[in-house]
Amino acid sequence: MNKVNILPSDTNIKITLFSEVSVGISANSVLFFAHLCMFFEENRSKPIDLCIAFLSLTQLMLLVTMGLIAADMFMSQGIWDSTTCRSIIYFHRLLRGFNLCAACLLHILWTFTLSPRSSCLTKFKHKSPHHISCAFFSLCVLYMLFSSHLFVLIIATSNLTSDHFMYVTQSCSILPMSYSRTTMFSLVMVTREAFLISLMALFSGYMVTLLWRHKKQVQHLHSTSLSSKSSPQQRATRTILLLMSFFVVLYILDIVIFQSRTKFKDGSMFYSLHIIVSHSYATISPFVFIFSDKRIIKFLGSMSGRIINICLFSDGYGP
């Protein structure tokens, strides 16, 4: 494994990757802080705020670990030992799974929250945040159990040049597996992720169907006094569809690029594209949440006003 040849040589790829990580960390930090504050400050806190906070925190940690991995790819001399490699790479793989679990749980909770009173899902609307937290961490534990084999396969290979290892960073690689074990683990991974994505699609489709029927009923009853302004339910539905469509497209691209990388023996371009695409959702999705929720915009505006007042007061311009 000639790591000099495997490393991406295009400076634009490095800039794109580090920019994606930096922007994603900033956006998820803002989203996490805003929803956490709103959850504790509002008189009637919404469980969905806690779920979005979970998602943003997961994506924040995912991008931080990706930043460490990128630093070892481009700026390190292969100084990580096996313990460091296993800890960081395994934790990064787990966070990718946690991100999928959190996104799936968010879509399900969103459907419960927006369901009309006549829906069979109404009884789930007022579940406490404790139930939401338990569901999230249960999914995470299952993912940890299913991914535990990766901790054994990740080793430090800073001085090895074998073509049998799968390159990860300058310091770390993944040990080769037999065809049967590779097939088995791949089948488990595909089944697990296909199940979660199917749940997301099912609940998103159910929500869209309910809101479409509700819109038809409203048009029938108030055909002469329709407003061109979209309702909060319609805006939420568009957000759900946008996030769901974006997630599925990126997931398909992720699979195609990963398979291409395997076919072309760890080509540097495919490896770089795989990293960028697989972290695009974590970078872009917080902007969708921020700009689709007026509460966050108002909250950020009020926080900016407080910071400006504090700065003016500390400089002696206050009363």
From Swiss-Prot:
- Subcellular localization: Cell membrane
An example Pfam family from this entry, by short name, is V1R
Provide the residues annotated with a glycan attachment (glycosylation).
Answer: N159
TM regions (residue ranges): 20-40, 50-70, 94-114, 135-155, 194-214, 239-259, 270-290
Give any GO molecular function from the UniProt entry: pheromone receptor activity
- Protein name per UniProt: Vomeronasal type-1 receptor 96
Main location, first listed in the record:
membrane
* Membrane topology according to the record: Multi-pass membrane protein
Q: Which residues lie on this side of the membrane: Extracellular?
A: 1-19, 71-93, 156-193, 260-269
The organism's superkingdom is given as: Eukaryota
Matching entries from CDD domains are given as: 7tm_V1R_pheromone
Residues on Cytoplasmic side: 41-49, 115-134, 215-238, 291-319
